[in-house]
Regions:
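Short N-proximal segments of mature Sec-exported proteins
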Residues: 22-85, 89
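N-terminal signal peptide c-region/cleavage motif recognized by signal peptidases
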Residues: 15-20
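Sec-dependent N-terminal signal peptides
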Residues: 5-14
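N-terminal secretory signal peptides that target proteins for export/translocation
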Residues: 1-3
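Surface-exposed, polar helix/loop patches in the mature regions of secreted/periplasmic/lumenal proteins
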Residues: 76-112
Length: 112
C-alpha cells in the first residue's frame, strides 16, 4: 500500500472518530413525524425524550444556580408548543436538534 493511501486511511479514521455518538430513540425521528403525531395526540414518547434530554443537560452540563436548571418556569406543555413551532419551520430536522436549540434558548433566558 502506498504512503498516500495509508495517510488517507489514517486521516479518514481520525475524522470519523471525532464525531459524536449517534442519537438514538424518539429524538432521532423526524420533525415531520412530530408534527403528524401532534395532530393525533401520539407525540408523548417524543416529548418525554426531549424532557429527558433537557433533564440530562441539567444534570450533567448546566453549571448555573437556577433551582430548575434550564427548565426555569417552563412546563412540558410550553415545550411541546415550542417544538411544534420548531418542527413546522424545520420539518427535515429532528426533535433532538430542536431540543438542543431549545436548551440554548432557555439558558439564554436565565439570569446571568
Amino acid at each position: 500500500m502506498s504512503k498516500s493511501k495509508v495517510a488517507f486511511a489514517i486521516l479518514i479514521l481520525a475524522f470519523t472518530s471525532a464525531y459524536s455518538a449517534p442519537i438514538k430513540g424518539a429524538g432521532a425521528s423526524s420533525c415531520g413525524l412530530w408534527v403528524e403525531d401532534r395532530k393525533v395526540g401520539a407525540h408523548f414518547v417524543q416529548l418525554n425524550w426531549v424532557l429527558g434530554f433537557i433533564s440530562a443537560y441539567n444534570e450533567y452540563v448546566y453549571k448555573g444556580r437556577a433551582p430548575n436548571g434550564v427548565f426555569g418556569n417552563v412546563d412540558p406543555s410550553a415545550i411541546g408548543v415550542w417544538l411544534d413551532n420548531y418542527c413546522q419551520a424545520n420539518p427535515l430536522s429532528t426533535p433532538y436538534a430542536g431540543a438542543r436549540r431549545l436548551v440554548e434558548e432557555l439558558e439564554s433566558l436565565l439570569p446571568k
